[in-house]
Amino acid sequence: MTIPDPILRILTLARWAPSGDNCQPWKFEVVNASHIVVHGSDTREWCLYDFDGHASHIAHGALIETIRIAASAEDLSISWKRRNNTAETSAIYDIHFQPEAGLPDDPLLPFIESRVVQRRMMKRHPLSNEQKRALADAAAPSLEVVFLETGSDKSNIAKLLWRSAYVRLTCPEAYDVHREVIEWNARFSNDKIPEEAVGVDPMTAKLMRWVMQ
């Protein structure tokens, strides 16, 4: 069948949805002009980080939310449901589109294609009260943003992250994942992490590539 233009435009944007290691654990099936099916998968068999497929499940949710945002540009709202009796490793989601005249574009629509990853050091100066309010207001009403600002709080978080990194970087299973998911000498990648997004300097990148041979 010929894919209707609005659905094609929505899916063209939806493929920008974030996923762990940019693995994009999904496939699209267009049923008709108002119904698509997302065939989800996960990477638990080979990716240490995808414990019980939860990371992929989060990616499925990010995809559905991106579809919702993209659909707003077509004056379409969505409803979705996961099919019953589908395996956790191959979840299937039915997504239906409903016309909604005058539906405003979602404020996040312009940012779908400008999605970036920041793994480098950020500025060290404290957030302003206005910035804190903006972050708090961006969360859903049922969520709370907690700011850890004291020296002891930041020290405790740093220790926790260091211990987590030590486990990841000394675990053979994680080594295999890192070797497979990085695309070296690349700024962009279709289905991996490009080297420039890893967040290391050129010399460290060369060392990493040599170690991971």
Task: Report residues per predicted region.
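Acidic, surface-exposed loops and disordered segments
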Residues: 1-213
